[in-house]
Amino acid sequence: MAKVKIKPLSDRVVIKPEPPEEKTESGLYIPDTAKEKPQRGTVIAVGPGRVENGTKIEMSVKEGDKVLYGKYAGTEITIDGEEYLIMRETDILGIIEEEK
């Protein structure tokens, strides 16, 4: 079977959420019922941007960016057993930049 690829439209992005924390900093395991919904992930695909007042607005994020988003942002989808989120770029709160 062919691998499915998602191509988002307009100002939408596809994000692969980071897995939820399995245990606390002190080493206690967190049960599934108490795990926080992830709010960070990696951008997998980016739409072409949107048109506003006749001007094309380019996207601020790109594939591979690590981003923060709201707890209830986006639409959850499952493809080939993998969980993804599709959301508008405006639902992304920020890009995580690692210091070197």
UniProtKB/Swiss-Prot annotation:
One GO cellular component, as annotated: cytoplasm
GO process annotations (BP): chaperone cofactor-dependent protein refolding
GO-annotated molecular function: ATP binding; metal ion binding; protein folding chaperone; protein-folding chaperone binding; unfolded protein binding
Keyword set, alphabetical order: Chaperone, Cytoplasm
Major location category of this protein: cytoplasm
Homology family: Belongs to the GroES chaperonin family.
NCBIfam families xrefs: PRK00364.2-2 (NF001531), PRK00364.2-4 (NF001533), PRK00364.2-5 (NF001534)
Function: Together with the chaperonin GroEL, plays an essential role in assisting protein folding. The GroEL-GroES system forms a nano-cage that allows encapsulation of the non-native substrate proteins and provides a physical environment optimized to promote and accelerate protein folding. GroES binds to the apical surface of the GroEL ring, thereby capping the opening of the GroEL channel.
Protein name: Co-chaperonin GroES
Protein species of origin: Rhodothermus marinus (Rhodothermus obamensis)
Lineage: Bacteria, Pseudomonadati, Rhodothermota, Rhodothermia, Rhodothermales
